[in-house]
Amino acid sequence: MSEDGASKCQDSIQLIDEQKQFNEKTLEYFKRCIGERDVGLDYHVISVFGSQSSGKSTLLNALFNTKFDTMNAQVKRQQTTKGIWIAHTREVQTTANTGKGVDFFVLDVEGSDGAERGEDKDFERKAALFALATSEVLIVNMWEQQVGLYQGNNMGLLKTVFEVNLSLFGHKKDKQKILLLFVVRDFTGFTPLSSLQETLTNELQAMWSELNKPAGAEGSSLDDFFDFAFTGLSHKLFKPEEFASDVAKLGDKFTDLKREDYYLSGKYHQGLPLDGWSFYADSCWEQIENNKDLDLPTQQTLVANFKTEEIANNAFEHFSTAFSKLSSSLPGPELAASMKELKDQCTKEYDNYGSRYMKAVYLEKRGELLDKIKTKFSDAIAVHMSKLFNSLVSTFQSTVAQNAACQPLSERLKVGKERVMQVFEQETSDFVALELIPSVDADASALLEKIDELAERERGKEMKAIILRAKKYQFTHTRDDIVHLLSHPQDNVWQLVMDHFDDVFRRSVLKYKLPNLGDVTDESTAYDFQLDLIEEDNYALYLKIRSNAWTILYDIIHQYLKEDNVVSILRERFESKFRYDQNDVPRLWKNEEEVDAGFKVAREHALNMLNTLSIASCDGVEIVPDVPLASDEDEAQDEQGLYNEKRFGHILTAIQKEKIIQHFKRFANVAVVEAKRSTIKSHTHIPMWIYAIIAVLGWNEFMLVLRNPLFIALMLLIVGAAYTVHRLNLWTPLATFASAAVNETTHAVKAKLRTILLDDEHPKNASSKPVESFEMQDLSVNETKENANES
């Protein structure tokens, strides 16, 4: 602050006027005096009491370099100070030099026992109460010759001070002390200061003992409420140099912290920052003026509440402005660091000013400020968490989708979950570590729940895919082979079917079989479908695949072994035994007895297979699935625990078998009849004597051919061609070709003859037509019409 500014601040202002009105511009005066400096609690308030015209203002001006108005004794002795005035100074007169640094606010209180007030002691009492409530040191200004007097040495005023102090602090456990500094003016030294101190102390103790003390303060002593100090000042006019020296020595006690008799101990301070003192003083004076009981702690609490809330609001406003510029799209650690920095700046701003007020109020408002900050942070962090949640869900889904062809789902789920939770920890740990939010457990739980939901969904898809792949493999590798086994059945056909079924099923789940199981045969633990399932769910999936396999086998067998197909199987089996021998060469029947014997064997061979195909069994034991079929999983088990509601092994009923046998017998009977006819044809042949007659009668022709070279050559060509055709097995194509050629030739000849005949008849018809023919035509036409009408 400039010297001109300091000079203006040393000029006093009226804090409370003679009309008992508090100056509302006090805070502006403080700000003008302090400027941009942060004073905080580093200031002191000094008040002065004394009789009117006793030199109070003169003392303050000399000691603190203030500029209070003083009385001009050469003109008139009258009241100079009206009400209560206050001045600011940082220049205290000391023995070394003018001390600077500490801010002093000096209150010059209207003098007592003045003619202007007369018997009106109301303001005197209220001023004393105000000074006690706001000051650290209360200077009692008196002359040496007044010591020992009652009115002259302000004993009446001091009694008022004691009474007021008792009313303020008598019932309090933690009593607010104040220093009473007795300044003996015009001290000559003839009477030692110690003697004057003893006299004053005795008078004060006597006065204290006579006071009516409030409840709870009956046994209190004067020292519980006051500390006392005494000093003497030489005559200002007669001994100006000694007066100045005494004032400087007094100033040392206000500025030198190392002195044992340093006056401004921290126990006297009101504990209010300077920016709250004016509000506090105004509130106290309002209570005093309205004659209400003044409760200083309450007033201090009100001031603390008001000022800390104001400080907190300002800090939060600055915080909100900076926070609005913060981008929520920052990565988690950066966002947390930025939030932490804003929070620290806000709390630091509040702590710098708010911590100077009552601790309880300061902490309460600090907590409210932190709650408001946390609310802001919670909203922003919630937005960040929502974006992070969606991002991590997408990351998990993409991770699970990657390498699906070469990596099992369980590993992809594990990697995806670990990656997501690692990123979540990296993105959110700083929020908790920096105490921006208490915990992210709820967000982590929600994320885990979503991941588990997605994982369960992926497991469901993969389970369906595994089931579908196994089902497709089983159907593809089972259908044709099983149908082939059934269409060409052997006596152990069902054993072959089951062997093939077991082999196909084993291969369909081979990739999921656990290695190195040794002799372990428990199928509930033999397979791992790599879906990160518990043992029970893993086994349930295995049972589902096996159930589908049994269902496929059931459908193939029962759909193929219908009545018509079984009849065909029996016919083929009958024919293979009846028409062919053991070398698969067609039989040539010689007689009916041989046909009947072969028929009996072939029929038994076929009908025995009917019994085998009617019920699926191995070694005489019906085949029963070890799991329920897919279409009847909900059917109840029988007493043996077997799922036989669908009776897997029962293929043909008795009625169906009867129908099959009837169809088979018809076919077999036809085959027998045809075989017997073939035996009859083989016995009906040309007699040998016919060949002898042909040889005798055709001898000449035969010899003619042998003697003619042309016929010999033609015969050799024909024989050679016939041999070639026979060796190449071309008789059938040759016969087909000959038949086609004959047919074409026949058609061509017929067409030619038809053309010739039509050409011959046309001229005759054109030359003349007999009358009779027309008549016959007419008759025939009429007859046709009559027949049509009759019909």
Curated annotation (Swiss-Prot):
TM region(s), chain numbering: 686-706, 710-730
UniProt topological domain (Lumenal) ranges: 707-709
Gene3D superfamilies assigned to the protein according to its UniProt record, in alphabetical order: P-loop containing nucleotide triphosphate hydrolases
GO biological process entries: endoplasmic reticulum membrane fusion
Localization, UniProt: Endoplasmic reticulum membrane
Keyword set includes Transferase: no
EC number of the protein: 3.6.5.-
Binding site for GTP: 50-57
Residue numbers on the Cytoplasmic membrane side: 1-685, 731-791
Residues annotated as domain GB1/RHD3-type G: 40-268
Family indicated by similarity: Belongs to the TRAFAC class dynamin-like GTPase superfamily. GB1/RHD3 GTPase family. RHD3 subfamily.
Protein name, entry field: Protein SEY1
Organism annotation: Eremothecium gossypii (strain ATCC 10895 / CBS 109.51 / FGSC 9923 / NRRL Y-1056)
